[in-house]
């Protein structure tokens, strides 16, 4: 029985109880959300211990960190370090997206070390192994695609991005639409090229019921991949993207009937003024399924600082109702991220998600009040504790110690807070009577 099957029967699972406790909501609230498809809990039956993470309506916006090798840089130890850094800095999930080296080994190593849910994109493995064997991904056998899904499910992958919404109609719309930035989804590119070269429908779309059988057997979450997402602001919310979203909504109906949990991937590159419309459109067409925004990137010119660009997009997306954000690092569009990039990406995205959650009422700024009180009292330890990244806050202060330990080197003896605190404590306050 899957989490969704149990929820539909009225059963509250241990995972639902754990999510409820972490989110400060009732177990029944979580059960209803899972039953309706508005909350997903990635937890493969083949993993003995994985944190119960709830994604969806009424819950804290979650942050995903992607890791993985490239063809140019294959360093499994570094990828493990990146995973550990993401976990230490409180990413909620990981995605292992390697395309270089032994793909089975690196995936299993990450699964072994990660206490949080791990996702993947199985068509990467199918395409890469075909390229190694036959020279090009267009020679993929359909069976190779499904074997990759089944293998990764047996390994314990908790959620998989499946490119099942690329079909002939979405490709026709993409062709007619034309784009400034082209198609930027790697999985979408593999599938689209295969379809065009072979003159056939996408097997992942055509055999979606088979994918549902595999997902139901192992109870992993289908992350409905957005292959038609824009890779440039100029292409945002175009006909190809909307056409794909319509297909995704129809596939989600079938997944829910089968008792399979889903989340829906979204943009991408999108200007701030279109984020709310995209969230409304996705929630309407996909009947409230959890929305997984990739970044989003709200301007194309932030190279080297795209984690900041994404943090802005994450805040706006979470505020508008998005449920899950994939981080972006400073290396985005430039290079494979290093461990330090991963840390920066996780923290920046967590800040954006936190800001958005304040808008949608997930929290009332309790941590902000804690920080405000600590600052007023010049209590530096309490300030560190309240910070999003205590270690970084402490590092900066320790590197530049002030002469007066109550203050910082920005204001020193002219610290406004200290001056006012001392004045109010010592001055004649009859003026306020």
UniProtKB/Swiss-Prot annotation:
Disulfide bonds: none annotated. GO terms for biological process: thiamine biosynthetic process; thiamine diphosphate biosynthetic process. The keyword Lyase applies. [4Fe-4S] cluster binds at residues 408, 411, 415. Keywords: 4Fe-4S, Iron, Iron-sulfur, Lyase, Metal-binding, S-adenosyl-L-methionine, Thiamine biosynthesis, Zinc. The keyword Iron-sulfur applies. NCBIfam families: PRK13352.1, thiC. Catalyzes the synthesis of the hydroxymethylpyrimidine phosphate (HMP-P) moiety of thiamine from aminoimidazole ribotide (AIR) in a radical S-adenosyl-L-methionine (SAM)-dependent reaction. This is Phosphomethylpyrimidine synthase 1.
